[in-house]
Amino acid sequence: MTDADAQLKSNALQRLQGWFANPTIGAVGASAQRSGGVQQEQVHRNMFELLREGESAHDSTPFLEGSLMMWRSSGFHSSQLNTGSNADDAQIATQVRLNGLRSIHDSETQFQDVAPTTHEGQRRQKIRRAQGLQRLLLRHRKHWRSSRIGDFSLILRREAHFHLTAPLLMR
C-alpha cells in the first residue's frame, strides 16, 4: 500500500518484500521523511519511530506508516478492517499481529512525502490520526492483558497509556 504523494526510493519495494522470506513476518512498514513540516513534528516523529523500532525488535508494532507498507494476504482479511474508522494502516498492522504474524517497522526503508503547509492543516491531520489510533486501541482493549498474544499485550497497554491516559493527565 502506498499513498499517491509518497516518493519511494528505487529499492524500497524490494527491501520491504525481502522481509517476507521470514515466515513469521506478516506486515512491514517504512519510515517517513517529511518535507515542509514544523520542527516539533520532526521531534515527535523521531521519538515515535524509536518506539516502533523497539516494539518491532521485542515483538511487533501496532502502528505502521500507511504511506508505504506491505502485508501478507494470508495475514489480514479485508473484512477485519473497520471502514468507519481512520488509521487503516494501524488497523492492518494490529490485526496482522492478532492473527498470529509479526508486524514490524523497517527504519532503513524510507519514503518521502510532504506535510500540510499550514499549522492548521498539520493540526487537523494530527487530530484525525490520533483519533483513529485511540479508537483502535479502545476497540482492542480486551487484548491489553491477553496471554494469547504474549508481549504484544504489553505493547498495546503502553500505547494505550501514550494515546489515551497521558493526554488526559496533561489537561
Briefly describe each language-model feature range:
Residues 2, 10-85:
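Long helical/loop segments within the catalytic core of UDP-sugar-dependent glycosyltransferases
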Residues 3-5, 88-89:
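Acidic active-site catalytic centers that drive phospho-/nucleotidyl reactions
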Residues 5, 51, 96:
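Residue-level signature of catalytic and energy-coupling elements of molecular machines
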Residues 7, 70, 113:
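Short aromatic/basic micro-patch
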Residues 7-9, 93:
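General alpha-helical segment detector with a strong preference for membrane-spanning helices
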Residues 20-48, 83-161:
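Catalytic donor/gating beta->alpha subdomain of glycosyltransferases that bind UDP-sugars
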Residues 57-61, 134-135, 169-171:
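Short amphipathic alpha-helical segments with coiled-coil-like heptad repeat character
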Residues 159-171:
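Core segments of transmembrane alpha-helices
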